């Protein structure tokens, strides 16, 4: 239900933002064409980056660590939300544990979850990427992700991910 609420709000943001340049502000990307814009958003971050990706891959993790090293040194906080190493259901838990440890050593804050992990990124509490792409795992061409500028949606994702999960989430897209 919470995911439907976020998708509804993002859909509202997409349709209400038609006056702006859709390709720059609000857009839907496929698994084959989001990376360049996503990486630019990451490199434009000034305060913080939160990436929630249930699945992770060594290639994407080490690419992210390398790409964001200077950002981190400049004070940008990076948080990764992902499954516990033994919750992946495939592969070697020791390998996932090592990836988590390498991200920690690189200065990333790691929040692990056991049951549900959404797929999104929030940059500077305003730029939101939300969809079914695992941002830290292998891309699938048929997956998609939406990019919107919305402090409200960013706030809701933060509340769902880090806040009181028992609190009812408002789903009124006309706020």
Task: Please report, for each region that a protein language model flagged, where it lies by residue.
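Short beta-strand scaffold segments in enzyme catalytic cores
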Residues: 119-122, 146
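General small-molecule cofactor/ligand-binding pocket signal
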Residues: 79, 108-113
């Amino acid at each position: 239900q919470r995911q439907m609420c976020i998708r509804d709000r993002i859909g509202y943001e997409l349709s209400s933002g038609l006056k702006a340049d859709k390709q720059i502000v609000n857009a839907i990307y496929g698994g084959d064409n989001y990376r360049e814009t996503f990486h630019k958003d990451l490199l434009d971050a000034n305060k913080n980056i939160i990436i929630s990706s249930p699945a992770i891959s060594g290639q994407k993790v080490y690419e992210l660590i390398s790409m964001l090293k200077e950002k981190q040194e400049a004070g940008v906080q990076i948080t990764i939300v992902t499954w516990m190493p033994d919750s992946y259901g495939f592969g070697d838990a020791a390998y996932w544990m090592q990836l988590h440890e390498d991200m920690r050593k690189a200065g990333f804050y790691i929040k692990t979850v056991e049951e549900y992990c959404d797929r999104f990124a929030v940059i500077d509490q305003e730029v939101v990427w939300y969809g079914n792409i695992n941002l830290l795992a292998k891309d699938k061409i048929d997956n998609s992700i939406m990019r919107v500028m919305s402090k409200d949606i960013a706030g809701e994702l933060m509340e769902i991910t880090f806040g009181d999960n028992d609190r009812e989430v408002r789903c009124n897209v006309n706020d």
